[in-house]
Amino acid sequence: IAKEVIGIKPGFKHFATLHILNTKRGTFFLADTSINHENSTEELVDIARLTYDAVRYFAHYPVMAMVSYSNFGSNPEHGPIEIHNAIDILHRDYPEILVEGEMQVQYALNKQLRDKQFPFNKLVGKDVNTLIFPNLSAANTVFQMLLEMGAAEIVGPIQIGLNKPIHFTSIDTSVRDIVNLTTMAVIDANVYEKVTLKK
């Protein structure tokens, strides 16, 4: 409904959501955790671009990995062709976005292991702070697991890609999460107003 009523940001065909995880290892961003079910190449490109902008908005430099069950085409027969194609498009058309994949989560989050096994990767020496998942099932399962395990303070879902500030909550959203999302909505509204007035 939000997509039809509010519309998508210019230059995109899809919107998404992300969650912010504050952990002992630092802050991480996960997308897309609530909207797109089985991501096509086009959807993955839009999700990566929107997430890149959002992470920068939160004053972090996005180092992004598209995660899967295989690494850099190691399973050519059943590998995630959508991720391969999305990575190719992002590297070609959006070179400012530092993204690589596909790779398993352990290689995304362990740069020593990643760089030793795959020295050709474009993230050499860098710590990944942003994970893009191949589908909603994987993304939502991971963040729900971390939430229940108490492994991180989680903020979200934060919508990215709609024309106006809007955020979603579920029936079991905590008061703290509602306060966090309300704060973000106010900030988003102020930014939106300033951008609108400049036009």
What are these regions (language model features)?
Residues 1-81, 85-199:
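Anion-binding alpha/beta catalytic cores of soluble intermediary-metabolism enzymes, centered on
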